[in-house]
Amino acid sequence: MSFSERPRVTQNGPSMIHLFNVFSKFRKENDYDGLVNYLITNYSQNVKNRTFNFHNTGHIFHMLYAYVPSPSSKERKQIRLDCIENLLESTKNDFKLYEDLIKLMNGDDKCPCELITARLNDNIAYNESLKNKNFDSKPCKLKKEPIDSILFKYSINWKNSLNKKRSLPKSTTTKKSEEKENMDEIEVDASKISSQSSLSNLNGYTIASCVHDYVIEEHQLRAGDEMVSFIKFCKKCGHK
């Protein structure tokens, strides 16, 4: 189902803005148990074995985890209810992006992902036009839109990623063989070596422990598997 064909909310269901405000309240209060109870009570048909299913629910739960379309990402299909807290922690910035986009929409009752998708399609079309450009005509330009400054604020830049896809990888076989040949031809003049290198003596030094700054990131367990795990680690030293 394409983005334009996806249903927005269930028939006679709450508006997008209402859902966003509901989920926003749970986030601000860190009421994860309350959110789980809310989902079980109001969407019991989506719950099975403590797993919440997002499949065929349209845009409804984009307001929960702030789905951000990209050339490579897929929509989430399910989440373990026991992992709701980790899900909300790992999508804090995405949810702030949704907040800014809702302000930009100025009361329009639709999912922010539709704005992101429309702009992504603009970038894809522009990138395709560059690949098929006619040198006899003036190249087209991608007109700057208000959404661009918001996407830039959250480090979303498809232009660079699409350009990387557009460029073909260079063969490294020749380069490696040349490097090997060069390594074989290196000559060392022992008379010019003044002293042998050595490691500094650590005696007398004080090694300070890391002041950990932990973050939570989502990692796919296996390729092609929908199940994911949430890993907590220090941004400075990598401690888990």
Swiss-Prot record:
Statement: the UniProt record of this protein carries the keyword Mitochondrion: no
This protein's UniProt keywords: Transcription, Transcription regulation
The answer on whether this UniProt entry bears the keyword Transcription reads: yes
Task: Supply the Pfam families for this chain.
Answer: Baculo_LEF5 (PF04838), Baculo_LEF5_C (PF11792)
Record-linked InterPro entries: Baculo_LEF5_C (IPR021758), Baculo_LEF5_N (IPR006923)
Which GO annotations describe the biological process of this protein? regulation of DNA-templated transcription
- Say which domain of life the source belongs to: Viruses
Q: Which family does it belong to?
A: Belongs to the baculoviridae LEF-5 family.
* Function text: Required for late and very late gene expression.
* Protein's name in the database: Late expression factor 5 homolog
Q: Which organism is it from?
A: Cryptophlebia leucotreta granulosis virus (ClGV)
